[in-house]
C-alpha cells in the first residue's frame, strides 16, 4: 500500500505531520504498513525546482495507490504567469493528470460546536450533515478557448453527456447510502451547459428510483444553504458552482480546519478543504483535524479500511466533545491547544477507543 505524500505550502507540512502520526497508530493497531513516498508540489516545488509540478512528483503520484496532499499556494507566487502558479500549474495540473473528476466534501456540524457556527443555533437545528459532489474535470476552469489581453478576458464553459453522467452516478451512489436525496444545482434558465446538465441528470436519476432528485438554481442554492442547510443531503453540481458552494457550506461548522475532502479519479487525491493559510504557517496553531479526517477518507475509499476510518472520525469527535480546541474554533484563543497538541490528543484517543 503506497501513499504519495505531498505536504505542499503554508500550513500543509504541519498538518500533514499530525495526520501521519495518526496513520502510525493505525499501522501499529492493524499490523499493516503503508509505504509513504514524499514529493513536492506548488510553491514548494517552484522554490526548489522552478516548476509547480516536477516530473519526479508526477512519477511518485502515478506509482502510488493514493495521493495525500497538504495545501498549495500563497501570495509569494501570485506574480508568476498563471500557468506557472502553484494553483494552476500545480494543483489543477495534477487533477488533470490523474483524471480526477469528482470532489467529495462532507460537511458536518458537531453538536458540541454548534455555537461556533456563524449561523444561529435555530438555523443549524439538530445539526447539519451534507456532502457536496462537485464535478472537477470540466467546466469553465478547463474549457477552451480561453485567454486574456489588454481589452478582454474570456473563458468557456463546456459540459458533455459522458462527463455529466459520470458525476451524477457518483452523487446518486453516495446518496443511496445516506438519506437518499440528491439536489442538483445548475443555472439552466440561462446557460446552455446547464440545460444539458439538467437533462442528463434527470436521465441518470431514473436508474435510482429510491433516491429523490430535486433541481435548484445556483443563486437560490446559495441562499438556501444559509436559510436552511439541514434540508440538503447530497448536493450535485458543476466545477465552478461547486467551488463556490462547497466553500460556502464549509463555513457552516465555523472553520475550514474541520473539513476534509477527496477527489476521485484514476487515483484518488485526499486533501483538507481549506487553503495554505500562509499567515499562520510555522506557528503551530493551525487546525489539523481536516487533514486527519482526509486521512480517514483515504483509508476508507482507497484502502477499504472502513472500520479504521470510523474510529479516526470517532476519536476526533470525542476530543472535540472533551473541550479541546485549536485557535480557529476556540472561544478563548488563549486556552487553545497547538497543532501538535491536537494531533497528540487525537492519537491518544484513538489508542484508547481501539
Swiss-Prot record:
The keyword Cytoplasm applies. Its cofactor is Mg(2+); Mn(2+). Mg(2+) binds at residues 219, 243, 247. GO terms for cellular component: cytosol. It is found in: Cytoplasm. Binds 1 Mg(2+) or Mn(2+) ion per subunit. GO terms for biological process: L-leucine biosynthetic process. Pathway: Amino-acid biosynthesis; L-leucine biosynthesis; L-leucine from 3-methyl-2-oxobutanoate: step 3/4. NAD(+) binds at residues 74-87, 275-287. InterPro entries: IsoCit/isopropylmalate_DH_CS (IPR019818), IsoPropMal-DH-like_dom (IPR024084), Isopropylmalate_DH (IPR004429). One of its GO terms (molecular function) is 3-isopropylmalate dehydrogenase activity. The record marks 141, 187 as: Important for catalysis. Its EC number is 1.1.1.85. SMART domains: Iso_dh. Substrate binds at residues 95, 105, 134, 219. PANTHER family: 3-ISOPROPYLMALATE DEHYDROGENASE. Catalyzes the oxidation of 3-carboxy-2-hydroxy-4-methylpentanoate (3-isopropylmalate) to 3-carboxy-4-methyl-2-oxopentanoate. The product decarboxylates to 4-methyl-2 oxopentanoate. Belongs to the isocitrate and isopropylmalate dehydrogenases family. LeuB type 1 subfamily. This is 3-isopropylmalate dehydrogenase.
Amino acid at each position: 500500500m503506497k501513499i504519495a505524500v505531498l505536504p505542499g505550502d503554508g500550513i500543509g507540512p504541519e498538518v500533514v505531520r499530525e495526520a501521519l502520526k495518526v496513520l502510525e497508530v493505525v499501522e501499529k493497531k492493524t499490523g499493516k504498513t503503508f509505504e509513504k513516498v514524499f514529493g513536492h508540489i506548488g510553491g514548494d516545488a517552484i522554490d526548489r525546482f522552478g516548476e509547480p509540478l516536477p516530473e519526479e512528483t508526477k512519477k511518485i503520484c502515478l506509482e502510488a495507490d493514493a495521493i495525500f496532499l497538504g495545501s498549495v499556494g500563497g501570495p509569494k507566487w501570485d506574480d508568476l504567469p498563471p500557468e506557472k502558479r502553484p494553483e494552476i500549474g500545480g494543483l489543477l495540473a495534477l487533477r488533470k493528470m490523474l483524471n480526477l473528476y469528482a470532489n467529495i466534501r462532507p460537511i458536518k456540524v458537531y453538536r458540541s460546536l454548534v455555537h461556533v457556527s456563524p449561523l444561529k443555533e435555530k438555523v443549524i437545528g439538530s445539526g447539519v450533515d451534507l456532502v457536496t459532489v462537485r464535478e472537477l474535470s470540466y467546466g469553465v476552469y478547463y474549457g477552451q478557448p480561453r485567454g486574456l489581453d489588454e481589452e478582454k478576458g474570456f473563458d468557456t464553459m463546456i459540459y458533455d453527456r459522458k462527463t455529466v453522467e459520470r458525476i451524477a452516478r457518483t452523487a446518486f451512489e453516495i446518496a443511496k447510502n445516506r438519506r437518499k436525496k440528491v439536489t442538483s444545482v445548475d443555472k439552466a434558465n440561462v446557460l446552455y451547459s446547464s440545460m444539458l446538465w439538467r437533462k442528463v441528470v434527470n436521465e441518470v436519476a431514473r436508474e435510482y428510483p429510491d433516491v429523490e432528485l430535486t433541481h435548484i438554481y445556483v443563486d437560490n442554492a446559495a441562499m438556501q444553504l444559509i436559510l436552511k442547510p439541514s434540508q440538503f443531503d447530497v448536493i450535485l453540481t458543476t466545477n465552478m458552482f461547486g467551488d463556490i458552494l462547497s466553500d460556502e457550506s464549509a463555513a457552516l461548522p465555523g472553520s475550514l480546519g474541520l473539513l476534509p475532502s477527496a477527489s476521485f479519479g484514476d487515483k484518488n487525491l485526499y486533501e483538507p478543504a481549506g487553503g495554505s493559510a500562509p499567515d499562520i504557517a510555522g506557528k503551530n496553531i493551525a487546525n489539523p483535524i481536516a487533514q486527519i479526517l482526509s486521512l480517514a477518507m483515504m483509508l476508507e475509499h482507497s484502502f477499504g479500511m472502513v472500520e479504521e476510518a470510523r474510529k479516526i472520525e470517532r476519536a476526533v469527535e470525542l476530543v472535540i466533545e472533551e473541550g479541546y480546541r485549536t485557535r480557529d474554533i476556540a472561544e478563548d484563543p488563549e486556552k487553545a491547544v497547538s497543532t501538535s497538541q491536537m494531533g497528540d490528543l487525537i492519537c491518544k484517543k484513538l489508542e484508547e477507543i481501539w
